[in-house]
C-alpha cells in the first residue's frame, strides 16, 4: 500500500511552514461560526510556545509577541470546571464546559500555549480529510467537510480534526489562509501508535 507523499517530499521547509504566529484567520470559515461565540473568542486568543528569539540587547525579534494569560482565557470563557492544579491554574491544564462544546487549555507560567475546542455535535459529522489537499484553501476545505470534531490552536497553526464513521481521526492544519499540512486517518493511527497515545494497540 502506498502512503501519501504529499506531506513530506518535494516542497522545501520554508514553503510548508513559517515561524510567524498564526492569526486564526481560517476560523471564520467553520460552518455555523457566526452562531458559535466560542469561535470568535478562540480567534482573539494568542497561544504562544514561550519560545522567543531575542537580539543581543534582549529585544524580542519581530517585536514583542502577543500572549494570552490564564486571566484572559477566564475572561473569555468563565471559570474552568476542572484544573490539573487548582491552586495554580496558570500552570497546567484547565477544562471549560460551554454551551457549544468543551474547551481544554494548556498553560505554562501563566501563558496560554495550546487550546482545543471540541464542538458539540462535531462527532456526528462523519468525515475524513481524504478529499482535501494543501492546494485547497481553508475555506474550501471547511465548506466541503463541514463541522469539525475539534479545533486546536497553537502558536504556529490552527488545526481541524474530523472523526469518520469508524471513529478514526484525521486533520488538516492552517496558517493564515493556507493549509500547510493534511494528516490522513492512517497517518494519525500510525502517529498514535508511535507516541503510545493509542491504548488499543
What are these regions (language model features)?
Residues 13-49, 53-60, 68-111, 133-134, ...:
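A cross-family detector of function-defining hotspots
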Residues 119-135:
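A low-complexity, Ser/Thr/Gly/Pro-enriched, surface-exposed linker/loop concept
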